[in-house]
Amino acid sequence: MQDCILCGAAQEVNPFSVGSFDGLSAFSNRETEPQKASRPFDKSRDGLVPSGGGASLVLESYESAVKRGAPILAEIIGYGFSSNGDHISVPNIDGPKRSLEMAIRNAGIALDEIKYINAHATSTPIGDLNEAKAIAEVFEGHRPYVTSTKSMTGHEMWMAGASEVIYSTLMMQNNFIAPNLNFEASAQLNIPAQRVNMEFDTFLSNSFGFGGTNSTLIIKKVK
């Protein structure tokens, strides 16, 4: 087992890289208001907005980080993974739910310790709905803040999982939760449409992929 690895991804936006998504009719048709097209969880969402970039993280054992004097930004305390979908581009409810439950069991923490969830929600009608149902079922009786940073960045495709861990870690370090932009209609989840200023030390991040591959990370601030 490696003590230290560099992990992450990069995504270039061009007709070839996003063609498969277009073939699945996954894109938003809101061309007259592109700034409002990415609207995860909102009732009027109609598809995702593609974007790209690059994100890298150093993942290593605590002993390795201390030995080389690295600033430790956060610790992964829980991980869940499941493979279950109803369609190549549509996750069902059971798969994401099992991924969430597995990560929480692995972390060994109570539900109310998780103050923020960075959802996978890409602004698609069925995908967002099923993820919301999975979160609501797992966190029944608890109301952590839930947002999707894709409302601000669009869907960064293959790099989204890595970048969203970075975004969430920056929020945790700087004591705020970024808003879920373009969210207008009410929902069962606790989704803030405005920035929330608050301290929190544990967050959960979902990344769900084609074919029903579902992963969940729980990350804690190192004090």
Residue ranges and their predicted role:
Residues 101, 115, 136, 147, ...:
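Generic hydrophobic alpha-helical scaffold/packing signal
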Residues 71-75, 109-113, 145, 178-181:
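Flexible, glycine/charged-enriched surface loops at secondary-structure junctions
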Residues 120:
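Glycine-centered flexible beta-alpha turn that most often forms the glycine-rich phosphate-binding loop
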Residues 32-107, 116:
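Condensing-enzyme catalytic core mediating Claisen C-C bond formation in acyl metabolism
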Residues 1-64, 158-223:
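Conserved beta-strand-centric core segments of catalytic alpha/beta enzyme folds
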Residues 85-96, 123-139, 156-163, 194:
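Short glycine/threonine-rich loop-to-helix capping motif typified by GTGT followed
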Residues 24, 103, 134-138:
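Alpha-helical structural signal in soluble globular domains
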Residues 142-154:
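Conserved phosphate-binding/catalytic loops in two-lobed NTP-binding clefts
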